[in-house]
C-alpha cells in the first residue's frame, strides 16, 4: 500500500519567505487545495496532511473539514523553519505548540511529523529524540536523495524503527532511473514525464516496498504569484505546475493510497520491522 501525503502550506511558505512577512502575501491555499480535495474524493482516497501550526490557527475550520472527511492531520512544525536552523529548544517548542493546536481543533491525537524541506539531516538527528519525547511515533522527514537543502544518502529504503528511541521512520520514497536516484513526489512529479513516477511505483511494488508520495496544494495552483528568488529554487517551484492536476488524477486512478498511520500499522501487522541505530544515518 502507498501513502498519499500533502504538506499543507501556502505558496509563499514553500519559497522560504520570512515568517514575519507572511501576512503581506496573497493567501491562496484553497486555490490549489480545493482541486486536490476534489481528486481525493473522486478516487475515494484518504491522505495525510502534514499541517503547519500557523495554518491550523488561521484556518481551524479547514482543518476540521479535512479531519471530518477522513484525512489524517499530522504536524509540519509551526513556522516552516528548517530543523537544522533551529535550536533543540526552539524545535521542541514548535512541535509541541503545533500538536496542541491541531489536536484542539480535531480532537484526534497527532502522531506523525514531517520536517519542512525534509530538514532532519546529519546535523539535526537530535530532533528524533525530541519527537519521541513530545508524543510523536512516526517521522517522515529523512530523504535518501541528497540535495542542496536536505538528504542523508545512506538512509535505508524502507520503513524502519530507530533503535535508540522507537520512532518509526518512513523516509522519502525513491526509485532508480539509470544511474540516478529520484524521489517520488513534489518537483520530481512535475519535472519528469508521468511515466517516470508510474514506473517508480511499479518498481517499488515489485520489490515489496511501500511508497510515500508527497505533494503541496500550491502545485495545483499554476497561477500563484511569481516572485524573484534563487535560480535553482525558482526552477523547482514554478516549472510545469499545469502538469500537477492531470498527473495526480492519473496517479490516483492507477494506484491505491492511504494515510501514513494506516500504512505503517498494516506494515507492522504483516511482520517484523527492520531496526537501525541512528548511527547508521551518521555513517
How does the language model describe each region?
Residues 23, 181-191:
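Surface-exposed cleft-lining segments at the edges of enzyme active sites
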Amino acid at each position: 500500500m502507498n501513502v498519499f501525503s500533502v504538506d499543507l502550506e501556502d505558496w509563499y511558505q514553500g519559497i522560504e519567505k520570512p515568517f514575519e512577512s507572511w501576512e503581506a502575501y496573497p493567501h491562496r491555499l484553497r486555490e490549489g487545495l480545493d482541486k486536490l480535495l476534489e481528486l481525493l474524493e473522486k478516487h475515494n482516497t484518504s491522505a495525510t496532511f502534514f499541517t503547519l501550526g500557523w495554518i491550523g490557527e488561521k484556518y481551524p475550520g479547514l482543518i476540521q473539514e479535512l479531519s471530518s472527511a477522513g484525512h489524517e492531520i499530522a504536524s509540519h512544525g509551526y513556522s516552516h523553519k528548517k530543523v537544522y536552523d533551529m535550536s533543540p529548544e526552539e524545535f521542541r517548542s514548535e512541535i509541541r505548540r503545533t500538536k496542541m493546536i491541531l489536536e484542539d481543533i480535531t480532537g484526534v491525537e497527532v502522531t506523525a511529523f514531517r520536517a519542512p524541506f525534509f530538514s532532519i539531516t546529519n546535523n539535526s538527528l537530535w530532533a528524533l529524540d525530541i519527537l519521541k519525547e513530545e508524543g510523536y511515533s512516526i517521522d517522515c522527514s529523512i530523504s535518501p536523495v541528497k540535495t542542496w537543502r536536505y538528504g542523508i544518502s545512506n538512509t535505508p529504503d524502507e520503513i524502519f524503527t530507530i533503535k535508540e528511541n522507537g520512532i518509526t521512520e518512513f523516509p522519502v520514497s525513491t526509485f532508480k532511473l539509470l544511474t540516478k536516484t529520484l524521489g517520488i513526489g513534489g518537483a520530481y512529479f512535475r519535472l519528469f514525464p508521468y511515466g517516470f513516477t508510474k514506473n517508480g511505483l511499479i518498481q517499488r511494488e515489485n520489490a515489496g516496498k511501500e511508497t510515500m508520495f508527497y505533494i503541496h496544494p500550491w502545485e495545483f495552483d499554476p497561477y500563484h504569484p511569481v516572485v524573484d528568488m534563487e535560480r535553482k529554487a525558482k526552477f523547482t517551484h514554478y516549472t510545469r505546475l499545469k502538469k500537477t492536476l492531470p498527473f495526480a488524477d492519473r496517479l490516483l486512478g492507477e494506484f491505491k493510497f492511504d494515510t501514513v498511520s494506516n500504512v505503517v500499522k498494516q506494515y507492522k501487522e504483516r511482520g517484523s520491522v527492520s531496526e537501525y541505530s541512528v548511527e547508521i544515518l551518521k555513517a
